[in-house]
Amino acid sequence: MNLSATLILAFGMSMDAFAASVGKGATLHKPALREALRTGLIFGVIEAITPLIGWGLGLLSSQYIMRWDHWVAFTLLAFLGGRMVLAGWKQQPLETSLVGKHSLGVLIATAIATSLDALAIGVGLAMLQVNILHAALLIGLATLIMSTIGMLLGRFVGPCLGSKAEIIGGLILIGIGCNILYSHIGEAMLAHLPG
C-alpha cells in the first residue's frame, strides 16, 4: 500500500471521529482549544491503537472479529447517543445536563465506539503487504487533526442551537452507529448474492 492510499485510508477512518467531535463540540458553550486538543488526542490515540490490535488479531482469526465489531460499535454509539438525546429532550439547562457527559470515561467510550471500524481495517491490513506501524500512525494523526477541528467547528454550532445541541449530538452518534451497522449488513448481503 503506497503513501497516498494510506493517507486516504487515514482520513477516511477519521470521519466518524470527526462527526462525533462536531456533535460533542456543539454541546459545549465554547470548548477551549485545550479541550479540543484533549478530545483530538484521545480519539487519535485510540484510533491508532485499534488497527494495531485488529492487525494482530487478523493474523489469528479474522472471521470472528469481523462478525461482531459492527454490533459492538452500534450498541455503544446508540447507547451514548440515546443518553444525550434523552437529556436534551428533558430540556435541562445545558450546563446541568452535560455534567459528566464530557468526562474522560464518556470520551474514551465514544472514541472506542467510533474506532471499531479501524479494528476491522486492521484485520484487513493483516492480509496485505503494509507497514502497520506507519498506517496506524497516519490514522491516529489524521484522527487527532479531524477531531480537534470537529470540536472547534461544533463550538460555533452549539450556541446557535442551545439545548437542542445535545439532541443533535446524540443523533449524530446514533447515525454513525446505524451507518456502521448498515454498511456491514449491506456487505454481508452482497456477499451472499448469486453470481
Curated annotation (Swiss-Prot):
Q: What is this protein called?
A: Putative manganese efflux pump MntP
Report membrane topology: Multi-pass membrane protein
Alphabetical list of InterPro entries matching this protein:
Mntp/YtaF, Put_MntP
Naming one, the record's GO cellular component terms include: plasma membrane
Q: Does the keyword Cell membrane apply?
A: yes
**Record field: transmembrane:** 3-23, 40-60, 68-88, 106-126, 132-152, 165-185
The family annotation for this protein states: Belongs to the MntP (TC 9.B.29) family.
Show the GO MF annotations.
manganese ion transmembrane transporter activity
Where is the protein found, in the record's own terms?
A: Cell inner membrane
Q: List the Pfam families.
A: Mntp
The record's annotation in PANTHER family points to: MANGANESE EFFLUX PUMP MNTP-RELATED
Q: Does the keyword Transcription apply?
A: no
